[in-house]
Amino acid sequence: MKIIALRSSLKLAARIAEELKTEPVMPDERRFPDGELYLRYDEDLTGHNIFIIGNTHSDAEVMEMILTLSAIQDYRTKSVNIIAPYYGYARQHQRYKNGEPISSQILTEIYSSYSNSIATVDIHDEKTLSYSKVKFSDLHANDAIVRYYKNVDVDYVVSPDDGGLARVADISAKLGKKHFFIEKKRIDDRTVEMKVPNVDVNGKKLLIVDDIISTGGTIAKSSGLLREKGASKIYVSAVHGLFVNGSENKILQNADEIHVTDTVESKFSDISVYQEVCNYIRDIDA
């Protein structure tokens, strides 16, 4: 096997390569004077199962992935497998208004035209999986989160909305804790009311878990409500930590700690999904 490490996932790819007792492959990469990306893979990839590890969140990451897929066509590889820990554009999985693109569809069609399989971790919407021409696997970070918090004293695991209830129910069961979700009620097209259900959290230690922290609004509001109800300690965790516009500062006004996975590298990426990804790679490379 060969592990190709793209810029967005260097640390995770290095840890995966170390676990699998190999060295990550990196391209000769630079920018043309006009800003366009140049890359080249000069290591012989012939006969190997290739695993490209890199996110597809920013436009630059998308281009790096597409150019990598094109570049390695020169080698007679055994297989080409994309592992995008954070699969970008999955929020645009359908057309909401006329004239809009279905972004996740066109990108997935491109990726799957040049690969034998695709995998990601906790994709935002599973509709995107159906756009692939090859097998598209959605790995899950629940066990990684459980590994991190198994020795942390918490009383409840909390979902900031009912959409994440299945995730929180699984994590809480594995931790041997109770769980609940923050209730939401839409008042009008601009106003959503959030409230804590009939659960006594006074003096309790809570772990809030979500799939994505982007602007942090929902997590910040949830933390504030729980603090008002007397929670003594609030941990915040998520699979993907994007932290748009410094949203961690907003969250930490009421939360005590933030710990997210390393699907997106940040100073809060204390939880690793490398075991989940390694198991997936071993199944293909067996």
Curated annotation (Swiss-Prot):
ATP binds at residues 34-36, 91-93. The lineage of its organism: Archaea, Methanobacteriati, Thermoplasmatota, Thermoplasmata, Thermoplasmatales. This is Ribose-phosphate pyrophosphokinase. Pathway: Metabolic intermediate biosynthesis; 5-phospho-alpha-D-ribose 1-diphosphate biosynthesis; 5-phospho-alpha-D-ribose 1-diphosphate from D-ribose 5-phosphate (route I): step 1/1. Its EC number is 2.7.6.1. It catalyses: D-ribose 5-phosphate + ATP = 5-phospho-alpha-D-ribose 1-diphosphate + AMP + H(+). Its cofactor is Mg(2+). GO terms for biological process: 5-phosphoribose 1-diphosphate biosynthetic process; purine nucleotide biosynthetic process. It comes from Thermoplasma volcanium (strain ATCC 51530 / DSM 4299 / JCM 9571 / NBRC 15438 / GSS1). It comes from the Archaea. The active site is at 184. Mg(2+) 2 binds at residue 161. Keywords: ATP-binding, Cytoplasm, Kinase, Magnesium, Metal-binding, Nucleotide biosynthesis, Nucleotide-binding, Transferase. Mg(2+) 1 binds at residue 124. One of its GO terms (cellular component) is ribose phosphate diphosphokinase complex. D-ribose 5-phosphate binds at residues 186, 210, 214-218. Binds 2 Mg(2+) ions per subunit. Belongs to the ribose-phosphate pyrophosphokinase family. Class III (archaeal) subfamily. PANTHER family: RIBOSE-PHOSPHATE DIPHOSPHOKINASE FAMILY MEMBER (PTHR10210), RIBOSE-PHOSPHATE PYROPHOSPHOKINASE 2 (PTHR10210:SF32). NCBIfam families: PRK00934.1 (NF002095), ribP_PPkin (TIGR01251). GO terms for molecular function: ATP binding; kinase activity; magnesium ion binding; ribose phosphate diphosphokinase activity.
